[in-house]
Amino acid sequence: MKKIKTYENKNILILGLGKSGFSVAKLLLKLGAKLTLNDKKDLSNDDRAAELGKLGVRVISGYHPVEIFDEEKFDYLVKNPGIPYENPMVEKAEKLDIPVITEPEIALNVSEAPYVCVTGSNGKTTTVMLTQRIMDHNLSKNGGHAYAVGNIGVPISEVVEKATSKDLLVVEMSSFQLLGVTDIKPKVAAIVDIYNNVHLDYHKTFDNYVEAKLRITQSQDQDDYFIANFDQKNILEKELDKTKAKVQTFSETDKTADYFIGDEYLESKDDHHIMKISDIKIPGIHNQQNCLVAIAISKLMGADDSDIQYALSTFTGATHRLQYVMTYNDRKIYNDSKSTNIEAATVAIPSFKEPEVLIAGGLDRGFMFDSLVPLFKKHVKSIVLYGETKYLLADAARKAGIKDIVIVNTLQEAVPRAYELSEAGDVILFSPACASWDQFNTFEERGDFFVKFIKELKTK
């Protein structure tokens, strides 16, 4: 870890505990900062808050003390990425011209290990896991390691102390995190895709969302590389305007891109066959595109075809992202709880050749589901719907001509009904197409409950 002086003796307010708040607090203490931690939740019985208190952090919880800004001067506010900028503490800090940053800004600037960054509306976690797997296989030959960190669930601050110049950080960046960075310079940055109707409750407009994503490349220069989706022409134009890095592209079908999906192989434009598609374990065209991004990043960082082929042929999928759960009575069951928007369901549903019994539903964000009608018509034989959006999704299912439409209240009710509708040889797919917050705290919690309910089928 680099011993930088940026935060030494600085008075820093951390807003929001969480995983990243806890980790960045410990990191900042080692960098010599004076810390105050504030969380609207009551932390009086929180073990992590107690640990920070013993280390000298002032902990204020249960409310937001906006008046604290009148009592003392802060040099930085480090914001939990999920906290909106309309939060009164953030608004006050911005009014006073106090820099509002997020954990990656601090952690990446003290990292001895080189790093690459990946963002996107869908597919970024799988891409990060694939890249980490390829690069770990490559770096281990010389005693190094690749670490998957960031939005994937492992705070960067947790890893930077042990990561050395022989290692690599593969960083998943959300749009929330990217809004709070001003000076990160990844050797390779990649945007897997950008879709509308994603996090607009946070970013307000699609243009704001795109601008947040583009911050991943804003500090890159001609010595760096930027990986862009050749098929999203409207976004590509904005990316090319923004970046100063050298650009490589990937495409589902366009052979003028640097990397593309061929008939039998994942290929590069110099006619090089990198990986046989049939050897890739994770299903779906979208996952083949994720593989292309991971290949592009890894090749730039020194991996060869043998590293790629080993990693991609042994990777069985990220949890909650078209995750294979089990085969039960000749039904293959998949958990795609990360499908928190229509676009994610759009790529999940066509991933299988077998007839599908689909479970969907969740938080109502005011979207219509008519774009799913053609996919329902082609791939879905029966559908079980729950949550706030169940009737909206039922309308789309009726338009698709699906005869078996079952409406229930909860996911727990949905699982056995889906099994009853299925036959040997079918796929039971949980791809909600909606956020989880009507009934669950996170998509991870929702996915864990789905897997639990599926396993309970075997005991009945």
UniProtKB/Swiss-Prot annotation:
**Catalytic reactions on record:** UDP-N-acetyl-alpha-D-muramoyl-L-alanine + D-glutamate + ATP = UDP-N-acetyl-alpha-D-muramoyl-L-alanyl-D-glutamate + ADP + phosphate + H(+)
In this chain, ATP is annotated as bound at 120-126
| Pathway the protein contributes to | Cell wall biogenesis; peptidoglycan biosynthesis
Keywords, comma-separated and alphabetical: ATP-binding, Cell cycle, Cell division, Cell shape, Cell wall biogenesis/degradation, Cytoplasm, Ligase, Nucleotide-binding, Peptidoglycan synthesis
Note whether Nucleotide-binding occurs among the keywords: yes
Which locations, inside or outside the cell, does it occupy?
Cytoplasm
User: A GO molecular-function term, please?
Assistant: UDP-N-acetylmuramoylalanine-D-glutamate ligase activity
Pfam families in the record: Mur_ligase_C, Mur_ligase_M, MurD-like_N
Q: Where is the signal peptide?
A: none
Q: Name one GO biological process term.
A: cell wall organization
Q: What class of enzyme is it?
A: ligase
Q: Name one GO cellular component term.
A: cytoplasm
**What EC designation does it have?**
6.3.2.9
- Cell division as a keyword of this entry, yes or no, is yes
Provide the family line. Belongs to the MurCDEF family.
Q: What does this protein do?
A: Cell wall formation. Catalyzes the addition of glutamate to the nucleotide precursor UDP-N-acetylmuramoyl-L-alanine (UMA).
What protein name applies here?
Answer: UDP-N-acetylmuramoylalanine--D-glutamate ligase
